[in-house]
Amino acid sequence: GETDVNAHNIEQIEAKCKGKTTIRFITMGDSQRWYDETEDFVKEVNKRDDIDFVIHGGDMSDFGLTKEFLWQRDIMNGLKVPYVVLIGNHDCLGTGAETYQAVFGPTNFSFIAGNVKFVCLNTNALEYDYSEPIPNFGFMEQELTDRADEFEKTVVSMHAHPFADVFNDNVAKPFQYYITQYPGLQFCTAAHNHGFDDRILFDDDVHYIVSDCMKSRSYLVFTITPEKYEYE
């Protein structure tokens, strides 16, 4: 089956959105166990012709089993539009992180759609010892300047937002400091909570917008225009 899924799809996203000043994308996540609902999601999205790409906010798997990732990948590959998948805390269980990296790629990555950079981060600190920095500030810092002339706005996506149970709250403030350094920060997206939420977690007007799980048959559609952003 296909490996390096994110890299292949990012090529398509970047090519498709090149030169656009308005982009429209979907966030969803936590599809673990809910295969039928995820198949229905794919059918729903395929009925639309206004979506540029989809961000899966993580937790494709329940137990980090290889077959779970492959089943979900095969379902998501049914989408007419390109998609990327973030790593969720359940995806880190057992050998899940290795499988995720083989099938989808690095756990921290970024891409540019139109004039918006999407910085996608592994925030599941609880599932790791200190062998790997979660969140990876070195990566976040590098993304501030990498391809700087190609984007004017930024969206930061993660599975678990600060103060969620698997986030390392010890670094919540430095994490937020790094995020607010990004040019034209629009908002942050997250999943994990199995419920919709839009909240400001710090004293700074940065919205964390959380998509519900697939069990609820729910997803969010974001539009970023030259003037503003909105979602439904």
Regions found by a protein language model. Give the residues of each.
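Short, solvent-exposed loop/turn segments at secondary-structure junctions
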Residues: 164-166
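Active-site glycine-centered loops adjacent to acidic/histidine catalytic or metal-binding residues
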Residues: 30, 58-59, 88-89, 159, ...
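Extended active-site neighborhood of metal-dependent phosphoesterases/phosphodiesterases
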Residues: 4, 9, 66-153, 171-187, ...
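N-terminal active-site segment of His-dependent metallophosphoesterases
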Residues: 1-71
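Hydrophobic beta-strand anchors of alpha/beta hydrolase catalytic cores
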Residues: 25, 54, 118, 154-155
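Short active-site segment of divalent metal-dependent hydrolases/proteases
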Residues: 33, 61-62, 91, 162, ...
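Short, histidine-centered active-site or binding-site loop motifs used for metal coordination
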Residues: 57-58, 122-125, 160
